[in-house]
A protein has these predicted regions:
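Nucleotide-sugar donor-binding/catalytic module of glycosyltransferases
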Residues: 2-175
């Protein structure tokens, strides 16, 4: 890999709010983040005061899975919900771009690189992608979210920005 190229790429912060995570799914997601091809990442995880999953268990899972980029984990003092937790995470992000991450996703290894390249090639401020839908055993049940939500409309350009203030069309896969 070209070291000079890596240095030139901006930092992308992955933010993840967790609450009562299924630890196997969280591990799979963290391993998929570890496998990202984009070279300049950081991860910030915030536990929304999970009552039955020990915070230490979440910390141990991250320590086991994340080895190639910096990460930090913290915990809310009380449960405030995902919106406020993601708001806090967004404020803490140091990257030029922010990738929002759900605790039960599994990302393809080139996801962040692909979204970053889309931002560059389109001179965009935001990018998002479709997703395959998997079941509890990680078997693909739909190769596109549109197979499950046929009324879902993907928007681009000025149509996206105008509509984004009124509704979310990104399904969480955004940067």
């Amino acid at each position: 890999m070209n070291e000079c190229m890596e240095i030139d790429k901006p930092l992308i912060t992955i933010v993840m709010a967790v609450y009562e995570p299924n630890m196997q799914w969280l591990k799979e997601q963290l391993l998929s983040l570890e496998a990202q091809t984009y070279p300049n990442l950081e991860l910030i995880i915030r536990d929304d005061c999970s009552p039955t999953v020990p915070f230490e268990q979440i910390c141990e899972c991250a320590a086991t899975c994340i080895r190639s980029f910096p990460y930090e984990i913290s915990r809310n003092e009380r449960n405030v919900g995902s919106n406020q937790t993601f708001e806090w995470l967004t404020q803490q992000a140091r990257g030029e771009y922010i990738a929002y991450c759900d605790q039960d996703d599994v990302w393809l290894s080139e996801k962040i690189e692909t979204l970053y390249q889309a931002v560059l090639s389109q001179n965009a401020v935001m990018s998002y992608c479709d997703m395959a839908v998997i079941d509890a055993k990680s078997d693909v049940i739909a190769t596109s979210l549109r197979q499950i939500r046929p009324r879902l409309e993907y928007l681009t350009g000025s149509a996206l920005m105008k509509s984004y203030f009124f509704r979310n069309c990104t399904a969480g896969c955004s940067m």
